[in-house]
Amino acid sequence: IHLSQYKTSEKNGYIFVHFSKKSETDLNNISEDTPISNYELYENGFSHKDYVFEEVLVDFKCDWSRIIENHLDILHIFWVHGDTIPDKDVNKNVLVSFNQKININPSYIESIYYYKNDPTKEFIRIKYIPPGRILIYKGDPSSSRYLQVLDHIPLGNNKARVIVRHYRKFL
């Protein structure tokens, strides 16, 4: 039996596995930088210390890329799940139109949505961090009291899991 070994890191209740080109036989002799810096929440405008979270695992009978696609689609969120999201300011009846700004760089793709009648007021920000993390902020990350972290995991052919964490800051 040959078992491959890969560098791992535990952060905030997650175990990250760095699948390098070649497995290592001596895990004490790995000199690579941490491969998960773009997954760190504090690198994305969010501090753990002021928030509490709840976690849910959700299994789907479809390819994980389809779930990512749904989570990135702002209209899907509010038109399909509009009545289940407890928010009077952001729902399908209020958001008849909006402005959108898209930021693309090598680490992430981010969509920022602004109210049409108040183009300086951000109501939601969705950040996709490849290969499978999505951050959904309620408003600007610097002042947001709510963050949803979605980690998409392929489990097999038309099988996927999403680890959903809801972070909330209380007054």
Listing of model-derived features with the role each one plays in the protein:
Residues 23-171:
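C-terminal catalytic domain of Rieske-type non-heme iron oxygenases
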Residues 1-16:
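Active-site-proximal cofactor/substrate-binding loop regions of enzyme domains
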